Curated annotation (Swiss-Prot):
Effect of gene knockout: Leads to an impairment of the symbiosis in M.truncatula and to a reduction of host PT4.
Intracellular or extracellular location(s): Secreted; Host nucleus
Function as written in the Swiss-Prot or TrEMBL entry: Effector that participates in the arbuscule development step of the symbiosis. Arbuscular mycorrhizal (AM) symbiosis is one of the most prominent and beneficial plant-microbe interactions that facilitates mineral nutrition and confers tolerance to biotic and abiotic stresses. Is not involved in cell death processes.
Segments for region (DWL domain): 58-96
Organism: Rhizophagus irregularis (strain DAOM 181602 / DAOM 197198 / MUCL 43194)
Coiled coil: none
Signal peptide: 1-17
Protein name as annotated: Crinkler effector protein 1
Location of the region described as LQLFLAK-like domain in the Swiss-Prot/TrEMBL record: 18-57
The record's note on its domains: The CRN proteins have modular architectures that include a signal peptide, a conserved N-terminus, and highly diverse C-terminal domains. The conserved CRN N-terminus harbors a distinct LXLFLAK motif, which is followed by the conserved DWL domain. A highly conserved HVLVXXP motif marks the end of the CRN N-terminal domains and forms a junction where diverse C-terminal domains are fused.
Subunit field text: Homodimer.
Family note: Belongs to the Crinkler effector family.
Glycosylation sites: N68, N126, N181, N248
Induction record: Expressed during symbiosis establishment in parallel to host M.truncatula PT4, the gene coding for an arbuscule-specific phosphate transporter.
């Protein structure tokens, strides 16, 4: 009785299986000859008697069994026995019935190459490890990063973090990854450092680590609008973003004191007579006019603000002098930033955004040191002394900055209604300065009092007196 046996050469996949028709009353030795005849090129230099045949019933949906196949528990088909001894009934369909093992010394180059590839792949899989990665700050949910620790790269890790978390800091050129694990703190400077660190984690059987991203800040003046939009995720799907990518800032207005308005008008008229402003004016000339506006705004809050030209600040993404910083005297915090431009407002908005983040991140560090829960907002002005843009910057619960940008307010110094336009700008500045004081209001003081009591520290008499005052 003739039967059909599906045969597979050891090391091949199910796709390479081939059928053999033979009478089951024949010997296994006959089956070896038929297999050699069926695969003449594969077994060109092999005698049929040197083939080993194994009974291995593997169904076509269990290809994975071939990768970890052990022949120790399988039946070797002996040449002197009849095929019916091993296959008394019709063999099951859609299964491998016989595994063909050529002699080691005479295996074909194709089979040897395949074996090497399989061994290499298996070794590669054995070195691939799934790490649990958390990106700081304030991200409690991590993600899996599966990587071959002998081929891991810093760029690969950064790209995976960028894909999973999209942290703005990674858009900064030269971002540095600081990694913390129970084994210690690490700052891999190259791929080899990273691989050695991962191998240590594996040997310690601790596959979870936290990544802190540090960015070398660059000068504020080096930032372009497109790079700032990319840094803060403002470009959306636009390759050439415009200022419309910023959410609108509805800047409020507070009526200034008559004294401050009259003083500003007198000072502007004096400057117009002695230092005229025009489209050709340099930034230094425009700064004289801008200072007059800022001074008039601060005069509405005697002794509460200090205007500091060329104050130097630094933050996670930028450093350098500000054209004008407005500090709150009580706390010495920078609450306002002014960027004066000759005419390039787009670049001015970009620079101001990085300046605002730098100012706010510094305030946040101080707030963390004092265990304050809130640290307010910071405001910005971008202007050429004729057109005024107002900005707001705040941080979300994951310490990511968000920005808003107002529509411009324009002052035409030759117009008859000059005072109306000047007053409108001053109203916005006064409102900004009023808002800038709110983080230090009695409400925040009360929140800090409650927080100290909850932590087990009773408020001191001086604290309560300060609250009453």
């Amino acid at each position: 009785m003739s039967i059909t046996l599906l045969c597979l050469i050891k090391g091949n996949t199910l796709a390479n299986a081939f059928p053999v028709d033979i009478d089951k009353d024949q010997l296994v030795g006959h089956l070896k000859k038929v297999i050699k005849a069926e695969q003449p090129q594969t077994f060109a230099n092999v005698d049929a008697k040197d083939l080993k045949l194994w009974r291995v019933p593997i169904s076509d949906d269990h290809d994975d069994q071939l990768r970890n196949l052990s022949l120790e528990d399988s039946d070797e088909l002996l040449a002197i026995r009849k095929i019916s001894k091993y296959f008394p009934d019709s063999p099951p369909e859609e299964c491998i019935h016989v595994l063909v093992e050529p002699p080691e010394s005479t295996a074909t180059s194709e089979v040897l190459k395949l074996r090497e590839e399989v061994a290499s792949l298996q070794a590669l899989l054995n070195k691939s490890v799934a790490f649990d990665v958390v990106v700081s700050p304030k991200r409690t949910k991590g993600f899996k990063w599966t990587v071959n620790i002998e081929q891991a790269t810093l760029d690969g890790l950064k790209e995976h973090i960028r894909k999973m978390e999209k942290p703005p800091a990674l858009e900064n050129d030269g971002a540095v990854l600081n990694i913390v694990n129970e084994s210690g703190k690490y700052s891999p400077l190259n791929d080899q450092d990273l691989r050695e660190m991962l191998q240590l984690f594996v040997s310690n059987k601790n596959l979870k680590f936290t990544v802190f991203i540090e960015t070398p800040s660059k000068a504020f003046s080096d930032w372009t609008f497109s790079s700032v939009c990319q840094l803060y995720g403002l470009n959306g799907e636009t390759e050439d973003p415009t200022m419309t990518v910023f959410p609108n800032f509805s800047c409020g207005n507070v009526k200034p004191s008559q004294e401050s308005l009259e003083g500003l008008m007198a000072e502007l008229k004096s400057r117009l007579d002695n230092t005229p402003i025009s489209l050709l004016s340099v930034e230094a000339t425009k700064s004289l006019y801008v200072y007059s506006y800022l001074l008039a705004g601060a005069n509405n809050f005697k002794g509460k603000f200090e205007i500091r030209p060329q104050k130097v600040i630094s933050g996670p993404n930028g450093h350098g002098p500000l054209d004008f910083a407005i500090d709150l005297c009580q706390t010495a915090k920078t609450v306002g930033v002014t960027e004066v431009k000759k005419d390039d407002f787009v670049k001015g908005v970009a620079q101001c955004a990085v300046q605002l983040e730098s100012s706010l991140s510094y305030r946040k560090r101080k707030a963390d040191e004092m265990e304050e829960r809130t640290f307010g907002r910071v405001f910005g002005i971008v202007t050429d002394a004729e057109k005024f843009y107002f900005m707001e910057c705040s941080m979300d619960d994951q310490d990511r900055p968000s920005f808003k940008l107002s529509k411009p307010v324009t002052v035409v110094y030759e117009d008859n209604d000059l005072q109306t336009k000047v007053e409108k700008v001053l109203e916005h500045i006064v409102w900004l300065l009023e808002e800038a004081q709110k983080p230090d209001s009695a409400l925040d003081v009360k929140e800090r009092e409650i927080k100290r009591v909850r932590s087990g520290e009773l408020p001191k008499v001086t604290d309560l007196e300060g609250k009453t005052n």
